[in-house]
Each structure stands twice: as C-alpha cells, then as structure tokens.
C-alpha cells in the first residue's frame, strides 16, 4: 500500500534541480500568498483532458503538445500568444484531417517558466555565476544580482499565466478558431513553402471537405464546433513550492488537483522514484506525463508507472520519449514490449527535440530539422512494428519567425542562426518548420489510417 500523500509530503524527500533562496522567510511568505490566489484551471477541465487522453491511449485520437522551451516575462505579448495559438491550430487541422480522428491540443504555455539545468553554475569570460533556471526563479542577465533566486518572480509567473490563459480562452471560444480561417492560413503556408507542391494535395482535399460540409449546412456560423476549440495547458512540475501552493481540493470529488495547469510532467532529470517530484505528482489527480530518456530501462519504467498510475487508469499517464534519432530504434522497442507484456495503459508520445540538440560552429545550440524528422519517422515505424499506437508528438515551437533550428524547406543554415536567435534556453521550431512537421506527420497518419477499417459516418443534410 502506498504511503499517505499530502500536497507537502514531497518536502520529506530528496529533491533535485531546486534553487537556493537566500531568504527562506520571504519564500514561505510568497508561497502562502499564492495559496490564497484563485486557481488558474479547474478540476473539471483536467478530468475532461484525461478522458480525451484515454482515447489517445486506446488509439482513437492523437496528442499534439507544443510550445515554448521556456516562457519569459520579456516576451509576454498578445501577438506572440496569438501566433502560437494560430500555428498550433493549423497543425491540428492538418493532423485531424489526415488521421481521421480527434487531435488533442496541449500547449506548453501559461506555466512553462522553470528549466532544469545540467550544471548549477555557468562561466562567461572567466566569471562563474549561478545558472539561469527560468524567469520564475532568476534573471537571464549575466550579473550577480540577476542570478539570485527571487521568490517574487513566482507571483509574476502566476499573473502572467493568468493573463495568458485569459487570452487563450478568448481565442478558443471567440471565433478566432474558425475552421475557415485556419484553412486559409494553411493555404498561405502551402503557397509560400518551397515544398508546397508536396502538401498541395492534402490542402485541396481539406478544401473539398469544407465545401461539402457547407453544402450540408455545416458552417461555422451555424455550428459552434467549427468556430471554437479546446486548448489545454501544460508545463514541467519543477518548482514544487509553487505547485503545492496551487494544489487545491476539488469540491465536487474531494480529490486534490494541481490548478497551475491541466497537465504536469516530470523531467528526465527529476524522475527518481524515491525523490520529491515523483512524490508530488503521484498524489494529484490531473493527467501527468514523464519524460523518458536514454537512461530509462524497462524495469524502471514499470516501477515509474506503478508509482504514477497505480490504478492503470487510461489517460492518466503520458510517456514522452526523448531518445535522439540515433538511439530511438534501440531504446524504444524494449519499453513498448514491457508495457504490452504487463498490460499497462499509457499514451506514447515522441519528443524529437531534446535528443537531437547539437552545437553549431558559431557556438549556438541548434537542432537539425532532418534529425527531428528522422526520430519522428522511426517512432512511427517502431510502434507499427510492435503493434502499439504512436499517440502523439511533443515539440518545442513558436509562432514567430525565429532562426534557431537548422533545416526545413526554407533551409535555415548555421550562418542564419544569429539572425533571429531569441530563445532564452533551447532552440525551437519556427512557424514554418512547425507546419512542415505537421504536414509530414499527417502523411504518416494518413498511411496509418488507410491500414485500418473506416468508421461509419452519418451526416444529416442541412436545410
């Protein structure tokens, strides 16, 4: 029987990736203040997401998870949020049509402020200072003052998350998600992309379907489902003091839910079974995820599942696999076989970003688009050969025209990286690269769909 859990039981465990605050009294005061603030999301929304993820686990839907490597205070602008939302919608429409099933949209947004680091300090020009750990903890400026962890930043992160969520809800329900608009945006991408001829056929089929639905009376003006959408939020549960303060009892069920986001995940560096991050995540009722890197073997994975999803509840646990294009073929199959052998219910999703990071000649971290796509293709191949469901993709992306990942049809090169390299942490796919990934994945989903029986569809004609 699992030990008794409470929102603060993690405090008795060893913890990794925690900042050292110089004034613990001020930290406690901020955490107490956060505990009085309204929730950012609601338990019913988290349950709704879990039900949709259960469909993904059953092979009946696909998960699209994407967003910033790390949100920042400086880049908190309405146009940046709008552009992210637009690109994620464009990706989802293409994947929905090609796969013939629901796409669950999950943003790395409205809470993705903290980042684990490989070293506690960094050196620039011979000077050593604490590492930048995300705007919720300290500043990116390389000064002694900026790098001191400041608990007031948690209050700033809460307020920014609330404002971001408010705008996202308005976009999702206020008509910006109109399917006709999204299709026009995709046509613009196809027209302007050097590889547009490859995607023209799919775009044409979507246009035909929209014309057919309009002829049947299914228009955005008359059908709310064609002008609104659902978008859920997610982030890594790294700052456990913040997460504890935002964890509340649901009045309808009596269960504990994290209200900082709909979906939280544990990172590859903090998933030790006897440590604080797993202890916290095991007790909340939200759907949760776990990053699975090269160091995770089948036996440890099964123990991780037993800790985070002891009831084997469909939709509860998503495994976010991040191996690298050169390792996925060796490391992923044993994990899939162990899950199938033990009858575990999980969502399998592919993070093709973190295992494919390299350093360019100019010193910039980057991710080659061809390596990203090689890992995605291998992920689909492996799941197909193992008889399991390739449930989704998890990408670091932006709606902006940055130059951080090399490659893609518009051929960002290493010499281009300095043009618009804006990330505070890891390189992200830009808008065009994100859409190109979606179109390539859609081709794979179409092949997968053509290999299974078509469901019966009934459409009532309009007036």
Task: Please annotate each region the language model reported.
Residues 70-71, 76-324, 367, 375, ...:
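Active-site-facing alpha/beta catalytic cores
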Residues 48-50, 274-277, 304, 333-335:
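Glycine-rich, charged/polar anion/phosphate-binding loops
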Residues 64-69, 106-109, 350-353, 396-398:
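Short loop/turn segments at strand-loop or loop-helix junctions that form parts
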């Amino acid at each position: 029987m699992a030990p008794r859990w409470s929102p603060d039981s993690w405090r008795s465990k060893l913890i990794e990736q925690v900042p050292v605050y110089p004034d613990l009294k001020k930290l406690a005061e901020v955490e107490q203040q956060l505990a009085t603030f309204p929730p950012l999301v609601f338990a019913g929304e988290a349950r709704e997401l879990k039900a949709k993820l259960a469909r993904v686990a059953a092979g009946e839907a696909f998960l699209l998870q994407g967003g910033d490597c790390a949100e920042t205070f400086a880049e908190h602008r309405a146009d940046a949020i709008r552009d992210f939302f637009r690109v994620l919608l464009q990706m989802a429409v293409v994947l929905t049509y090609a796969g013939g099933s629901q796409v669950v949209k999950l943003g790395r947004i409205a809470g993705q402020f903290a980042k684990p680091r490989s070293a506690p300090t960094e050196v620039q020009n011979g000077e050593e200072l604490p590492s930048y750990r995300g705007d919720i903890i300290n500043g990116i400026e390389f000064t002694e003052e900026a790098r001191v962890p400041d608990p007031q930043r948690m209050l700033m992160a809460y307020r920014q998350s609330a404002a971001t969520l408010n705008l996202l809800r308005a976009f999702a329900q206020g008509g910006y998600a109109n399917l006709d608009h999204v299709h026009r945006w995709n046509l613009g991408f196809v027209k302007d992309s050097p590889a547009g001829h490859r995607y023209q056929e799919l775009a044409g089929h979507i246009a035909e379907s929209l014309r057919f639905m309009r002829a049947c009376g299914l228009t955005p003006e008359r059908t709310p489902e064609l002008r609104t959408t659902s978008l859920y939020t997610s982030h890594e549960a790294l700052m456990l003091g913040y997460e504890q303060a935002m964890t509340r009892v649901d009045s309808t069920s009596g269960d504990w839910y994290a209200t900082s986001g709909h979906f939280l995940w544990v990172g590859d560096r903090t998933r030790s079974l006897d440590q604080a991050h797993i202890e916290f995540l095991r007790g909340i009722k939200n759907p949760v995820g776990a990053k699975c890197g090269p160091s995770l073997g089948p036996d440890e994975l099964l123990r991780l599942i037993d800790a985070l999803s002891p009831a084997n509840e469909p939709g509860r646990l998503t495994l976010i696999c991040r191996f690298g294009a050169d390792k996925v073929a060796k490391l992923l199959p044993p994990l899939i076989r162990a899950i199938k052998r033990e009858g575990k219910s999980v969502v399998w999703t592919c993070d093709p970003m973190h295992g494919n990071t390299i350093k360019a000649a100019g010193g910039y971290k980057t991710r080659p688009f061809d390596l990203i796509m090689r890992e995605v293709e291998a992920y689909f191949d492996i799941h197909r050969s193992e008889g399991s469901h390739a449930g989704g993709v998890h990408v670091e992306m932006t709606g902006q025209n940055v130059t951080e990942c090399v490659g893609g049809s518009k051929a960002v090169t290493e010499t281009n990286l300095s043009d618009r390299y804006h990330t505070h942490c890891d390189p992200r796919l830009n808008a065009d690269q994100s859409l190109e990934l979606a179109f390539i994945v859609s081709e794979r989903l179409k092949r997968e769909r053509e290999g299974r029986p078509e469901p019966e569809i009934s459409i009532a004609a309009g007036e």
